[in-house]
A protein has these predicted regions:
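Extended, charged alpha-helical "arm/stalk" segments used for dimerization and assembly
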Residues: 83-154
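Extreme N-terminal "head/tail" segments of very large remodeling/mechanoenzyme assemblies
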Residues: 1-78
Length: 154
């Protein structure tokens, strides 16, 4: 599997008529702030842009926000864009590497792009996990430890 490092995130909410840009440190990041300043929104938008749909609803969250995530993958820069259900990967020359409007297709495309190759064994059958498996940590919600986890998309 390739190494993925976030560089920056840009968000545009047409509904709220607001935009935001966040730069990430190349080695470590701590998302810190008071309640209702956007920590969960930023985290959720990162995973949504990459194709995950973490559990839970955020109050007042604009799910039509357009996002552009810049990431370094194995020392090469790529751009990941999400607008509604459409997602795309662009290389550093802003050429389309892959795009789709279907989430199930995106999981396969992104999993292949990242060389994600998790094999799940069940009884006598083996299946390759979709790209959703890369996001297991996004599905583990800290305030829901006692409740059942829903990892159906793996």
């Amino acid at each position: 599997m390739k190494t993925l490092r976030f560089k920056s995130m840009q968000l545009l909410s047409e509904r709220e008529k607001k935009a935001r840009a966040v730069q990430f440190h190349p080695n470590r990041n701590l998302i810190l702030g008071l309640n209702h300043v956007g920590k969960s929104t930023l985290t959720k938008q990162i995973f949504e842009t990459l194709g995950a749909a973490p559990m839970g609803k955020l109050e007042g969250w604009d799910n039509t926000t357009i996002t552009l995530l810049t990431a370094i993958i194995d020392d090469q820069e790529f751009y990941f864009m999400k607008q509604f259900s459409n997602r795309a990967i662009f290389n550093s020359e802003v050429q389309v590497v892959a795009s789709t409007g279907r989430l199930a297709e995106w999981a396969k495309v992104f999993g292949a792009f990242m060389n994600f190759n998790l094999v799940l064994s069940e009884q006598k059958r083996e299946d390759r996990a979709s790209g959703y498996g890369m996001y297991v940590s996004a599905f583990l919600h800290q305030s829901r430890w006692g409740l059942e986890w829903h990892l159906a998309h793996l």
